[in-house]
Amino acid sequence: MKHLLLLTLSALLYCWVSADTRCHSCYKVPVLGCVDRQSCRLEPGHKCLTTNVYLGKMWVFSNLRCGTPEEPCREVFNETNHKLGLNYNTTCCDKDNCNSPAPRPTPALALISLTSLAGLGLWLLH
């Protein structure tokens, strides 16, 4: 009887913890970082995923999202799309926000970058 009670409590605790697991969801691109950043709730039995896409050795973009019954997370390393010449790496994780994107770019950093580019443009015009 003790074992049945312990098993039931463990199952309830697992369902309660996994029901609140969240993943980041966005398309991450160079310079801009995560575009359309959101959060999704992970369904029980599924995992967060991050797919990194490369052209040769150059990173092109990443797709962060929750795995779903229609598109579950399947880890893949160096899968190649021969028509486009792209390589894909997909990793899976099941902790809260484990597929963490890079921090959002700060407005100050963007302002410094734009000011530097404007200064360079003016210098080139002289």
UniProtKB/Swiss-Prot annotation:
In its keyword annotation, does this UniProt entry include Lipoprotein? Answer: yes
Which residues form the pro-region?
101-126
Q: Kindly state the subunit structure of this protein.
A: Monomer.
- Changes after translation: N-glycosylated.
| UniProt keyword annotation of Glycoprotein present | yes
Its source organism is Mus musculus (Mouse)
**Covalent lipid sites (GPI-anchor amidated serine):** S100
Where does it live in the cell? Answer: Cell membrane
Disulfide-bonded cysteine pairs: these are C23-C48, C26-C34, C40-C66, C93-C98
Q: Name one GO cellular component term.
A: plasma membrane
GO-annotated biological processes = response to bacterium
Q: Could you tell me which residue ranges the UPAR/Ly6 domain spans?
A: 21-112
Which residues are noted as glycosylation sites? N89
Keywords in UniProt for this one?
Cell membrane, Disulfide bond, Glycoprotein, GPI-anchor, Lipoprotein, Membrane, Signal
Protein topology in the membrane: Lipid-anchor; GPI-anchor
Query: Which tissues is this protein detected in according to the database?
Result: Highly expressed at the leading edges of cells, on filopodia.
Which Pfam family, any one, appears in the UniProt record? UPAR_LY6
SUPFAM superfamilies per record: Snake toxin-like
Tell me which positions the record assigns to the signal sequence.
1-19
Which GO terms label this protein's molecular function in UniProt? identical protein binding
| Entry protein name | Lymphocyte antigen 6 complex locus protein G6c
Q: Which domain of life is it from?
A: Eukaryota
Which InterPro entries does the entry mention?
LY6_UPA_recep-like (IPR016054), LY6G6C (IPR039237), Snake_toxin-like_sf (IPR045860)
